[in-house]
Amino acid sequence: MAYRVLGRAGPPQPRRARRLLFAFTLSLSCTYLCYSFLCCCDDLGRSRLLGAPRCLRGPSAGGQKLLQKSRPCDPSGPTPSEPSAPSAPAAAVPAPRLSGSNHSGSPKLGTKRLPQALIVGVKKGGTRAVLEFIRVHPDVRALGTEPHFFDRNYGRGLDWYRSLMPRTLESQITLEKTPSYFVTQEAPRRIFNMSRDTKLIVVVRNPVTRAISDYTQTLSKKPDIPTFEGLSFRNRTLGLVDVSWNAIRIGMYVLHLESWLQYFPLAQIHFVSGERLITDPAGEMGRVQDFLGIKRFITDKHFYFNKTKGFPCLKKTESSLLPRCLGKSKGRTHVQIDPEVIDQLREFYRPYNIKFYETVGQDFRWE
């Protein structure tokens, strides 16, 4: 009898073991789900606190789904099984206030636009000074380098040209400087085709002094070139000036101006005196600002005269703790030229100068 009781009690033992194993497995699963849920909530709380979407990197798929429902996830890249989606628009950020310098402000602030104003000439006339001075104005954004679009790079197209420009706000003017435009035959037509409303700035200087400065710059790069006198004349005894030499031809301003007046009225061309830019920079820049239709922000308080260089420099500003002068090449000592050569060139330029004065309605007093 005892044998039977013991024999019947034996079979239920495997069922108890299975029940215990099932209960243990269920307990582990519940623990794992609770752990995953707590991790998800912790990451979600941090994401909300930091104000940016977070992606759960753990193994819990449930946690990932909960995060995706709560906030958009922005991982570094889509997984192979997911198509890429357009990113959500960023929250609006208050625009920082632009200071007077063109070098300040967010690089992505504003829009890249084609220039509304160009400094088109002339070489060695003072164009770099005008560019650096006008860049102080908060309503002007200028390209620092010379793009040479309308003379050398026109084939690249206007989209390429626009891509070079600094970003500007609606209230700002985009400007660039390339002095060789003034003597480029195709430049007026090309600029007109871009915009017939483009404002043009031409910095002019005594053509004899300009030619000597041009030669001095070339000599510093090519010390083996002929003398200034040798390049200026075909026959000095007869006084035959070589107008094929670029340094001489650039100074025949009225001839180049005729090409521009075929496309632009004189009211759209402003002439800056290179001489007055040295003696009265605030006055000349005041007229430039009037021409561009912006307030007179640049005044006497922005300049001081550098006796070593012999021309005005910018005082320190809010964006620059140090005064700004033009580069070392500016203000270099000119080569000594025979006074008789200078007199001959003055006589050569005289009729061109007079015609230029009459055309633009200004007497630059170069005689």
Swiss-Prot record:
Residue numbers binding 3'-phosphoadenylyl sulfate: K124, G125, G126, T127, R128, R205, S213, K330, G331, R332, T333, H334
Residue positions the entry lists as glycosylated: N102, N193, N235, N306
GO cellular component: Golgi membrane; membrane
Stated role: Sulfotransferase that utilizes 3'-phospho-5'-adenylyl sulfate (PAPS) to catalyze the transfer of a sulfo group to an N-unsubstituted glucosamine linked to a 2-O-sulfo iduronic acid unit on heparan sulfate. Catalyzes the O-sulfation of glucosamine in GlcA2S-GlcNS. Unlike HS3ST1/3-OST-1, does not convert non-anticoagulant heparan sulfate to anticoagulant heparan sulfate.
GO biological process: glycosaminoglycan biosynthetic process; heparan sulfate proteoglycan biosynthetic process
Subcellular location: Golgi apparatus membrane
Primary location class: Golgi
Disulfide bonds: C313-C325
Tissues in which the protein is found: Highly expressed in the brain and weakly expressed in the heart, placenta, lung and skeletal muscle.
Protein name, as recorded: Heparan sulfate glucosamine 3-O-sulfotransferase 2
Entry keyword Transferase: yes
Record organism: Homo sapiens (Human)
Family, per entry: Belongs to the sulfotransferase 1 family.
